[in-house]
Amino acid sequence: MYAKLSEFEEKVISGITEDRWLKLATELIKTGQPRACDPLDPDLPSGEEEAIAMLVAGKLEALGMEVNKYESQPHRPNIVGILKGSGSGPVLMMNDHMDTYPVVEPHKWDKTNFKPFKATRAGDLLYARGSSDTRGNLACTILA
């Protein structure tokens, strides 16, 4: 049994359809795959999310948001999109991250024909590096 959604919750998720999500998630997954970043392993290169950040910024601007970029490290900008409301009600903040882990054991990515950043659908599942951490989630956030 599922909890009943409020009218506000229904409105927030009404923009998320399977087709829109699949298209956007696929685009986000293949865009600007970052290098690894692991503070416990200084031999790995630093992370880089600039390409995905600029894509997200463009998507938010297209939705009519004011977009700000904050960069505390080179090639790792944070994107903030602001959509001003018309009333004095509460603020809704949605947040996600854009980095993904590097591909480990590429020989095990048989569901994607050994192309981990190629989103591949099998039934109700979407396989790709970043599909659940967290480009798929990010697609939902943008569509909401």
Predicted feature residues:
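Active-site metal-coordination/substrate-binding segment of hydrolases
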Residues: 89-144
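N-terminal helical capping/dimerization or prosegment-like subdomains
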Residues: 2-105
